[in-house]
Amino acid sequence: MLNCGDSSKDNNDFSDKDASSDAQKRYGIKSAVVEYIITGSQEGTKTLYFDKWGMRQAEYTRSVLTVSGFSKSINLVNIIDGDYQYMINIDQNSGTKTRNPILKSMDELKGQKGFNEFGEQMLLSIGANKIGKEEFLGKDCDIYEMRNIGTKLWVWKWITLKSETNSRGLEINVTATRINEGSVPKDKFTIPEKITLNEVDLDNIENEMREENK
């Protein structure tokens, strides 16, 4: 168990120089803040902060999910920074620390040249297929569909600006309302104080599951 207040203490942070090559770019812009509203079965807000071309990002989500008449409050922070990802439940002062899954995907797709190819391969790897184009918030978006989970994504420079999910009786829409390109305060990527983290090795879990299924 780890008590954390600063993610920079236990990861190898990417410098701007490291992220300057296309091989270290998730998104097509260097840094921005994107604000969203969440509607449907889940209602609330989400804010995405990122810099270093998406190699460092934080998502703050506050919402209420209603299923079959029962409601649950959601207050989550998801930080990706350097070697690690931190998924934090603010209300419970707890979370998990795992290896950064983006780095694993980049290694698997290292034959792709340029963020355009990498971004598309990332979407294809999760079962998304491009079905069209549409302007949204003044941006030219590509529309991708994941039929297996009933989701459509509106993607601009590999940033999802809008998503619609309709699956198993749940309808959840996440819609960007504002995009502010420019620098992001560093404290947005800092783990809140008094959070207890449980470190989880997802690779070990996957390997154990494979062994059990043999």
Name each model-derived stretch:
Residues 4-7:
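Bacterial signal peptide processing site
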